Amino acid sequence: MKKFLSTLLALTMLLALAAPALAENPTVTYYVRGGTAQYEPYLYETLVGLQKIQEMAGVDIDWTVVCGNGDEIKAQYVAMMASGNYPDIIQWQHNNSLGYVGGVAQMYADGIIIELNDVIDQYMPNYKKLLEENPQVAKTLMDDEGRYLYFTPINPLVTDLEKASVTWWGLMMRKDWLENVGMEAPTTIDEWYDVLTAFKEGDPNGNSEQDEIPFDAGSGGLLLFMPAFGITNGWYVNPETGKVGYGQYSEEYKAYLETMAKWYAEGLVQNVYADENGTLADSADPNLYADLAGSWKGLANYWEQRLPQVKEKNPNADFVAVQWPACVDGSGVSYADNYGMSYGDRVSTVISTDCKNVEAAARLIDAMYSEEGTNCTTWGTEDSDPINAKQDWTNGHGTYTIDPETGKKVETEWANTICENFYDGAFPVKFRYAMSHVSFPRWGAADYTMATREEKYVASSCLWAQASNALEYPAAIILTTDAQKAVAEIDNISNYINEMTYKFITGAEPLTNFDTYMDNLQKI
């Protein structure tokens, strides 16, 4: 027996020596923007959801988390780019002022990042399936030569909730003013005219003076009425023909201008322009706080951010979100410019040309786009403590628990951590000014953005989202250098458009000269 055991032990040891060591997971370097300096980068290494994604992909991450204010992080990003030594994966706002001059298109032209088409085909089944099932989304993620250059959080914008989660502004009114003049919130252009007239003549602020501003058009408020005339501000798609048009170069624009000029002439709109060049006026806030503005372009957080200060002037003040006015041709309710299908101007994730293991980098990112990966970057993991005790997973994903007494979200370690640390929102618990998104590549799961909001915030976003976005021009943000030059030339006409729009609305130029305006645009 002893001899047998000794022999068996010896054989076992020999087999162990002969067997190859278990392969270690490949490691990729991941460069990401964090929050301000107070947010500890080590959290990226400790969050359970991100650990789970690495486990799913069989890939480890060596993090570089850049923290600080705008100037500080821009300096670090520029220094990294100038060094010529690039991390494997770079997650950043590459296409805006904090990013690379020329955006990801120029990064590709300069040899900094790789094209992803073959990478997606070979190593990213989750992501490839999403693109195949959502061809319209896929188009917006390509450059104008059909290349995929970056990854980004994607909202498919199909369900009402998905639309509402990125719809945070629209038309708003003083609810108490509507009650004071005995009217309901308007739903058509004609009803808007009637309500604005009542605001002007009915002394709804109750100070016995005709000082009301029925519609404060600050921050481009009048542009929100363009979809009611079947056009948008800039490029749009005609839903009936499928052809691309330009809002300010159309006969529908003349009808829009006629209505806006009428409102302006009758004193129903004010604070439209800052100067005679057609520069749009600043926000409606001063007139709002002075108890003078009856309607305006507002954000869904105005109940929290603006109403308390208005109540200091008028304790009876209250706001109400107003739906987009129905199209004048009777085709329904439409709008655009609120939730676009362009993603490149947000945080985008690229794979650099210095990446020695593109397959590992691709597997990691693809795991984030899986259903489980999306849950990980949104909720954490079902079995992680304390999430399991604080969140409901009966629907296959996490859901915040709302305290019935306060109506507030029940705080969890995960929620506080991910919100405080991840740049560009992650959880919108502390990111108060707009609904936001997780910056990591991910798909859908828009429901989390609604779970932490005040009831009126959610209700207004849902109301504004109840409209067709068929006018939306799904242009890809990423353009090659030649295309960028062409767009720049097109943009040169904007000064003329702004100047003439100012003149038409204010009456400085009669609308009988609209055909001349159209001819001049054609020449330009």
Which residues does each PLM region occupy?
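Carboxylate/His-rich catalytic cores and anion/metal-binding grooves
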Residues: 111-140, 195-200, 208-236, 289, ...
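Conserved N-terminal structural module of periplasmic/extracytoplasmic solute-binding proteins
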Residues: 21-191, 229, 234-236, 244-248, ...
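Extracytoplasmic/periplasmic substrate-binding proteins
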Residues: 34-49, 157-172, 179-185, 218-269, ...
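Sec-dependent N-terminal signal peptides of Gram-positive bacterial secreted proteins and lipoproteins
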Residues: 4-22
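Short, solvent-exposed loop/beta-turn-alpha elements that line the ligand-binding surface or hinge
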Residues: 114-133, 176, 184, 234-251, ...
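Helix-loop-helix "hinge/cap" segment bordering the ligand-binding cleft or interdomain interface
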Residues: 117, 145-148, 152-221, 238-287, ...
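Conserved small-residue motifs centered on glycine
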Residues: 367, 371-502, 508
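Loop/turn elements at helix/coil->beta-strand transitions in domains of secreted/extracellular proteins
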Residues: 24-29, 57-62, 83-88, 110-114, ...
